[in-house]
Amino acid sequence: MSEQKIEVVGKLGSTYGIRGWLRLYSSTEKAESIFDYQPWFLKIKGQWQLIELESWRYHSNDLIVKLKGTEDREAAQLLTNAEIGVDLSVFPKLGEEDYYWHDLINCQVVNLENYTMGVVTELMETGSNDVLVVRANSKDAFGKQERLIPFLYKQVVKRVDLSTKTITVDWDAGF
């Protein structure tokens, strides 16, 4: 898989029934969108393996899936908790000021005074806007361990340079 870059989009949960079905936990914005990204790879024993989706449906409020070659409960149990990944090439291209969260993770964040705020470890969705969770450097001059910085392009986030993995923000280092 060296030529492919895999992004995790979900995870298999516990088995459902005796015919090889599994619960599915989707990381996509809309749970059903996970089915738009094919083919799937499962991380089994640390290795990504191509897997084919046979069928899916809702059971109550849960998504459940049937994978080809998984015919019974015992076979399905071997896949419990496996991460589901897709090749990054299947994601649609975005506009100039739009970014996938996975592109922003591990970016260095600096403010307009060129103070290094830390590194993006995750993003949160708040309803009104996304928020960068920035882990501060261990020797942060302001004693911060973590900063929450709203991802408001042009207002707070002034520049994103994915080639250097740098995000420039208009944000006080003391916050």
From Swiss-Prot:
Written domain comment of the UniProt record: The PRC barrel domain binds ribosomal protein uS19.
Keywords on record: Chaperone, Cytoplasm, Ribosome biogenesis, rRNA processing
A Gene Ontology BP annotation from the UniProt entry: ribosomal small subunit biogenesis
Xref: Gene3D superfamilies: PRC-barrel domain, RimM
A single Gene Ontology CC term: cytoplasm
GO MF annotation list: ribosome binding
Protein name per its UniProtKB record: Ribosome maturation factor RimM
Chief location of this protein within or outside the cell: cytoplasm
Subcellular localization: Cytoplasm
Organism (species): Haemophilus ducreyi (strain 35000HP / ATCC 700724)
The PRC barrel domain, residue ranges: 96-175
Function of the protein: An accessory protein needed during the final step in the assembly of 30S ribosomal subunit, possibly for assembly of the head region. Essential for efficient processing of 16S rRNA. May be needed both before and after RbfA during the maturation of 16S rRNA. It has affinity for free ribosomal 30S subunits but not for 70S ribosomes.
Family label: Belongs to the RimM family.
Subunit structure: Binds ribosomal protein uS19.
